[in-house]
Amino acid sequence: MAPGAPSSSPSPILAALLFSSLVLSPAQAIVVYTDKEVYGAVGSRVTLHCSFWSSEWVSDDISFTWRYQPEGGRDAISIFHYAKGQPYIDEVGTFKERIQWVGDPQWKDGSIVIHNLDYSDNGTFTCDVKNPPDIVGKTSQVTLYVFEKVPTRYGVVLGAVIGGVLGVVLLVLLLFYVVRYCWLRRQAALQRRLSAMEKGKLHKPGKDTSKRGRQTPVLYAMLDHSRSTKAASEKKAKGLGESRKDKK
C-alpha cells in the first residue's frame, strides 16, 4: 500500500458496534396465553382460548398449532394446525370430526372449540404460535377436565361472572334513568319559569288599563270643574255688565 493512501479496512470501533448490535439486540420472544384449566360436561362443548403478544405485526405466515397429551400419557400428538390462512384438522386421534376453528389471527386469537366432549378427552392441550420473524417463545398449556356435570366451583365462578356483568348493566341503566329524571325535572322547572314570564307580560297591559280607568273619572271631574268655573265667571261678568247699564 502506498504511503498516504487511505486504508480500505473497516474501523475496529465500527466493527465492534456492528457486532454488538447483532449479538446484544435479539428479537423479543413471542408470548402465548391460554387458560390454566377449563371444565366441561359430557356431551357438551368447550372453547380452548389461545392468544398471543408479539413485537411484530401479524404476518401473513402466522401459524397456530394445537397439541394434545392424554391424561396419564407421555406423548403429545398434533390435533390442529392453522397456516397460510387455512385451518387443518389432523386425521390422527379422536378429535378430527369434533374440532372447530373460531380464531382470528388479526385479533391475535387462535382459539378452537371441541364438540361432544367425552371422558377420554381429559388431558393437556398446548397452543404454539409462530409469527415470522417472531418465532421464538414458549408455548402455553391448558388442562381440560370432563365431568358428568360441571363442577360446583366452576358454576359458582361462572355465576359470579354473569352476576357481575348484570350488576354493571343495572348500574348503567340506573345511572341513565337518574340523569334522565334530573334533566326532565330541570326542563319542567324551566318551562314553568317561561310560562310565568309569559303570564307576567300578558298582565302588564291590564294593569295599565286599570290605572287609566282609575284616572278617567278624575280627569272628567277636573274638566267639569273647569267648565263650571268658566260658566260662573261668564255669568258674573254678564251680571256686572247689566248692572252698569242700569246705572247709566
From Swiss-Prot:
Disulphide linkage map: 50-127
Extracellular side: 30-153
UniProt xrefs under PROSITE patterns: IG_LIKE, MYELIN_P0
Transmembrane regions: 154-179
One matching Pfam family: V-set
GO cellular component: a single term: plasma membrane
Coiled-coil spans in chain: none
Domain Ig-like V-type: 30-143
Keywords: Cell membrane, Disulfide bond, Glycoprotein, Immunoglobulin domain, Membrane, Phosphoprotein, Signal, Transmembrane, Transmembrane helix
Family matches, as InterPro entries: Ig-like_dom, Ig-like_dom_sf, Ig-like_fold, Ig_sub, Ig_V-set, Myelin_P0-rel, Myelin_P0_CS, Myelin_P0_Ig-like
Protein's name according to its UniProt entry: Myelin protein P0
Modified residues (Phosphoserine): 210, 226, 228, 233, 243
Modifications made to the protein after synthesis: N-glycosylated; contains sulfate-substituted glycan.
Topological relation to the membrane, as annotated: Single-pass type I membrane protein
